[in-house]
Structures are given as structure tokens and as C-alpha cells.
């Protein structure tokens, strides 16, 4: 088996992507799988068309990597790849579209509104802030509709703070999503298919020292404490896993994805967002879930790769 790993790119998450790519290549090598890390450059399409790898595994993060564009090109090339197809990737990358689909399926997700920058400006920012504040109720979480690694994400507890949060989020995109903040236990649940159907790995519980699982808390060792498996009793853990599985299916994330939830003080799980290209760095969430499930990382990645190739052959 020969795998091309797509990593790098030009998004703000480039460094994280490169780290994920190197870690993935190292672990594949441990189980005897040949891989090559490639950047998404002007030579890539011709290279893939000529060399015809068995599989492409994209760990590209951000626009161009998770928004369905690369996935659509791979579909056109007829190359097997890990993760969601182009349409589902696009709809998951857009947090508002993903939440709408999840809500339509009857799954709980915090109340929200998405606002393009132009709408915010044209309709009088102060009036918009007042309306949103009254309708959604503080505290609120504001984040770019399209983006990852918690960049541009912040919490606000009053209208003045909401205005600052929106300015910060708009720095990362032309549309933001504002949702009601739910106090509880934050979880990341990795979903995989290793040839025996989809299954949820043990939830990883996230406890950030700052109280906010932002970019620094995600990638700087020591900023966040992770518990894998999460410190939940069996029934609550199962309810969270069931929701994550259903969300993964509704969004069509393929053989590998991650669903982020929060379990509130009444033990009810709420969908927050999902990732079509989970990070694989030393501090990333999915590798911790694999280890908690008893996998070696090399064997886990090998099984996902084989499942992705098998899935593609059945399409």
C-alpha cells in the first residue's frame, strides 16, 4: 500500500497540518506502510494522476483542506481518500450548515445565529447586537462559520463583550456564528470504521486551565488537561457516544471523523461541531482516543487506510 499524505497548505493552520502529516507518516512507517508527504501545490494533480497512489490521506486543515475543494478534485481523479466526500465535507466545514442538519435530524445543538459581515454592518451593529443579546441570552460563544483549531473563538458575557468577540471572529472570515454557551463537560468523540462498521472511540474530556479551549490550549503542552476516557458514568458516556455516532452518520463523515459535544449539568449531550480532518499531532484529540481504545497508532491508521480503500472500491 502506498499513501500520499496531503499536509501544509496556506491556511492559518498550516503548522498544525504539517505536524499532523509528519506524525501520521511516522506511525504508518511503524507498520510497514510507505507514505509520502505532499503539499497542495501546482504539481499535485499531475503527480497524483501519474503515480496513482492507493490512497490519499489529507490532514490539511482550514480552507482548501476541509471545505470540500480538495475532496472534489480527488473524486474527479478517481483516487481513494480518507474521510468525507466533497459535498459532506463542505457542509460540515460550514458550522451553520452542520448545525442546521443536526437540528433537522432531531439532535440537540445550542441555539445560534450566523451573521455575514456585510449584514452586521448594513443593519446597524448596535441594533443587531441588542437583538442577538436578547434572543440568545448570555453567555455566548462567537466563532467564524468556517474555520478550525479554535481560531477566532471567544466567549462573551455582555453586549460589549459580544461586539469585541464579533470583531475578533470576523478577522478570520466573512461570516460568524453566535451560539448560546452551555456550561458542562466538553468532549471530543472520534468515530472510525475499520471494516466492521462505524464505532465511537472513548470520549476525550477537555479541561482547559484557562476555561477556554482555544488555539494555545489545543497545541501548547500543559495548557489543557485531557482525560481519555472521559470521567463520565457509563450511561452518560453511552448517550454521548450514541449522539456522536448519529451526528457522524447525518453529516456523512466517512471512515474517520470527530464530533465535538458538551454534556450539560443535567447530563444531556449537545452537538457543537464536527471535523472532517481531525488533527494527529502529539496533543491532538483523536490519537488520545485511539490509545484509550487500546490501539497502537500505527495499527489504527493502517486499519482506517484499508477501510477507506475498501469503501472507495464499493462506490
What do these predicted regions represent?
Residues 68-75, 213-220, 276:
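Short, flexible, mixed-charge acidic loops at enzyme active sites
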Residues 35, 80-81, 109, 140, ...:
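Hydrophobic beta-strand scaffold residues
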Residues 157-236, 268-270:
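Phosphate-binding site of ATP-dependent enzymes
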Residues 1-7, 50, 91-179, 183-184:
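Active-site nucleotide/adenylate-binding loops and adjacent lid/helix of ATP-dependent enzymes
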Amino acid at each position: 500500500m502506498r499513501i500520499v499524505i496531503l499536509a501544509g497548505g496556506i491556511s492559518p493552520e498550516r503548522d498544525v497540518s504539517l505536524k499532523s502529516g509528519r506524525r501520521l507518516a511516522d506511525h504508518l512507517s511503524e507498520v510497514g506502510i510507505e507514505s509520502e508527504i505532499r503539499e497542495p501545490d501546482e504539481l499535485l494533480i499531475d503527480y497524483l494522476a501519474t503515480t496513482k497512489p492507493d490512497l490519499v490521506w489529507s490532514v490539511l486543515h482550514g480552507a482548501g483542506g476541509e471545505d470540500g475543494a480538495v475532496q472534489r478534485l480527488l473524486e474527479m481523479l478517481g483516487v481513494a481518500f480518507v474521510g468525507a466526500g466533497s459535498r459532506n465535507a463542505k457542509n460540515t466545514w460550514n458550522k451553520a450548515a452542520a448545525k442546521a442538519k443536526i437540528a433537522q435530524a432531531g439532535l440537540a445543538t445550542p441555539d445560534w445565529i450566523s451573521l455575514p459581515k456585510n449584514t452586521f454592518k448594513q443593519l446597524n451593529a448596535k441594533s443587531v447586537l441588542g437583538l442577538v443579546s436578547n434572543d440568545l441570552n448570555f453567555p455566548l460563544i462567537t466563532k467564524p462559520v468556517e474555520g478550525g483549531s479554535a481560531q477566532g473563538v471567544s466567549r462573551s458575557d455582555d453586549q460589549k463583550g459580544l461586539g469585541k468577540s464579533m470583531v475578533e471572529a470576523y478577522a478570520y472570515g466573512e461570516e460568524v456564528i453566535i451560539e448560546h454557551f452551555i456550561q458542562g463537560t466538553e468532549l471530543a468523540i472520534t468515530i472510525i470504521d475499520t471494516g466492521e462498521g462505524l464505532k465511537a472511540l472513548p470520549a476525550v474530556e477537555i479541561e482547559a486551565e484557562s476555561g477556554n479551549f482555544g488555539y494555545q490550549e489545543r497545541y501548547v503542552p500543559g495548557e489543557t488537561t485531557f482525560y481519555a476516557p472521559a470521567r463520565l458514568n457509563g450511561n452518560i458516556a453511552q448517550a454521548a457516544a450514541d449522539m456522536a455516532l448519529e451526528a457522524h452518520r447525518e453529516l456523512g463523515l466517512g471512515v474517520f471523523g470527530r464530533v465535538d459535544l458538551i454534556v450539560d449539568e443535567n447530563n444531556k449531550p449537545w452537538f457543537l461541531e464536527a471535523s472532517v480532518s481531525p488533527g494527529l499531532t502529539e496533543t491532538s484529540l483523536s490519537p488520545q482516543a485511539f490509545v484509550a481504545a487500546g490501539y497502537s497508532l500505527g495499527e489504527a491508521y493502517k486499519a482506517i487506510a484499508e477501510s477507506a480503500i475498501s469503501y472507495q472500491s464499493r462506490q
